[in-house]
Amino acid sequence: MSRFYLQVPNDTSLDDWSDDRIWDGLATRFDLDGWTLQTGTITDRSVLPMRSFVQSPMRHGRLFLAGDAAHIVPPTGAKGLNLAVADVGLLAPALVDLIRNDDRQLADGYSDTALRRVWRCTHFSWWMTTMLHTSEDPFDAQLQLSQLRWVASSEAGATGLAENYAGLPIGF
């Protein structure tokens, strides 16, 4: 089972996309010599806006936010679940210290610490989205090509993409 995304306008009606049209669209995009797209049952479909949202701060009194309650990123950068796990990795010891030891230090720093990673990953997801999803604006299209060329031809560009894509250290 796999999840695929086809770029369509946000106001697209799902009724306009039959299973055959979806498979044809994917086959066009995956038209590679020596490889054939394996079709199957489409179990779900939706129009997903490529949007970002960050709630700052990620704490209000005794309420701590983590994961999708605190931030939304487009799937292009593959960061949503990673961010949620990183949030919980910070929040769990903070809550243990707060509840068991009455030590507020980690809890008080949770939001600021988590937001450093959240903003970095939100920017990366935005960057990947603008680099990989076409724009009808000629100026934006040239910026996109410039970015793609830089990532494909520059060691620094490739390293930056790889570091952000593979994940930042937990303490970032």
What is the predicted role of each segment?
Residues 1-46:
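Conserved FAD/dinucleotide-binding core of flavoprotein oxidoreductases
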Residues 3, 15, 62, 114-115:
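Short, cationic motifs built from Arg/Lys/His that form the positively charged side of catalytic pockets
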Residues 45-49, 111-114:
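Histidine/acidic-rich helix-loop-helix segments that form or flank divalent-metal centers
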Residues 48-69:
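FAD-binding beta-loop-beta segment adjacent to the flavin cofactor pocket
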Residues 52-54, 70-82, 116:
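Glycine-rich phosphate/pyrophosphate-binding beta-alpha loops
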Residues 59, 81-84:
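Short, conserved glycine- and acidic-residue-centered signature motifs
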Residues 65-74, 85-95:
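Extended, hydrophobic alpha-helical segments in both membrane/secreted and soluble proteins
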Residues 78, 93-172:
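C-terminal helical "tail/cap" subdomain of flavin- and related membrane-associated enzymes
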